[in-house]
Curated annotation (Swiss-Prot):
PANTHER family: LARGE RIBOSOMAL SUBUNIT PROTEIN BL34M, MITOCHONDRIAL RIBOSOMAL PROTEIN 34 FAMILY MEMBER. HAMAP family: Ribosomal_bL34 (MF_00391). Belongs to the bacterial ribosomal protein bL34 family. This is Large ribosomal subunit protein bL34. The gene is rpmH. One of its GO terms (biological process) is translation. It holds the Pfam family Ribosomal_L34. Signal peptide: none annotated. One of its GO terms (cellular component) is ribonucleoprotein complex. NCBIfam families: rpmH_bact. GO terms for molecular function: structural constituent of ribosome. It comes from Bordetella petrii (strain ATCC BAA-461 / DSM 12804 / CCUG 43448).
Amino acid sequence: MKRTYQPSVTRRKRTHGFRVRMKTRGGRAVLNARRAKGRKRLAV
């Protein structure tokens, strides 16, 4: 069985990047929650 995590910078940015988070209301909610919690990194 192959390993499920095959890293790719492109795919990572496209699915979890900052701009993707900003697109939807839910994504912005995620960023705001992370800001409120004081996360050092908001998105990938």
